[in-house]
């Protein structure tokens, strides 16, 4: 497939071969980075980062990825410093920013915002998260992290823990994992279960799924535990949030019942769902996961820019 100019909006737009291709390119770029420190593929190209919602890892890893490719970055980390405050529409913002850039990365609280941006823009658009909908680049780096840790994805038993209702990272990841021969444990409070339409789609695609509230019962079965925080900002009602706040914590006591090879992942930021004592254990994979964002986003930027 021709990647030059392609938008990256939803993991649903990817085939398994697309995913595997991105992971291979990312692996090659990681090796080149270790050898050379920085590359020149995107020299003369400009990335615009439009972050209408807070971000640390996604924004900085995209910026780092572009710099590592030899390109430049412009953008904003808060809509409060832009003409959006004056009432400018998203479409007009996109049409303006594309005059200055070769590729746009956007994070926005509105579901479908990235798709709208892609329809308006003539340069490629990459979705860095749209509300509780999709976060495709996080999914790709998650798959990359798993594959680097285990040498495979097929045959693994993976638990998704926490806010499965509002968490866009687990929505995208679950849909991507359906391409592989995996078994999924969906572990959450009743109020935060994975949306029914996603569960039904996964089952239709042949994924073996267990839905449970019991983390202790599930932990011995897992190869990967993917932890998410309870997304306070997505709750329409503070009382509903307080009902589920602090539902789970992953700590060393819990992990005594896990496989020695279990890896704990988290898209971060965390609040209290993983105790800091886990950080020094062999189970912790979440900071390696952070690193994975750079080669994976380098691959996506380079491919959509047509320089790889």
UniProtKB/Swiss-Prot annotation:
UniProt pathway: Pyrimidine metabolism; UMP biosynthesis via de novo pathway; (S)-dihydroorotate from bicarbonate: step 2/3
Function per UniProt: Catalyzes the condensation of carbamoyl phosphate and aspartate to form carbamoyl aspartate and inorganic phosphate, the committed step in the de novo pyrimidine nucleotide biosynthesis pathway.
Keyword Transferase in record: yes
Family statement drawn from the similarity comment of this UniProt entry: Belongs to the aspartate/ornithine carbamoyltransferase superfamily. ATCase family.
Highest classification ranks of the organism: Archaea, Methanobacteriati, Methanobacteriota, Thermococci, Thermococcales
EC number: 2.1.3.2
GO BP, one annotated term: amino acid metabolic process
Protein name: Aspartate carbamoyltransferase catalytic subunit
Pfam families: OTCace, OTCace_N
Entry keyword set: Pyrimidine biosynthesis, Transferase
Binding site for L-aspartate: 86, 168, 229
UniProt cross-references to InterPro entries, sorted A to Z: Asp/Orn_carbamoyltranf_P-bd, Asp/Orn_carbamoylTrfase, Asp/Orn_carbamoylTrfase_sf, Asp_carbamoyltransf, Asp_carbamoyltransf_Asp/Orn-bd
Keyword Transferase carried by entry: yes
NCBIfam families (alphabetical): asp_carb_tr, PRK00856.1
Top-level EC class: transferase
MF terms (GO), sorted A to Z: amino acid binding; aspartate carbamoyltransferase activity
Catalytic activity field: carbamoyl phosphate + L-aspartate = N-carbamoyl-L-aspartate + phosphate + H(+)
UniProt source species: Thermococcus gammatolerans (strain DSM 15229 / JCM 11827 / EJ3)
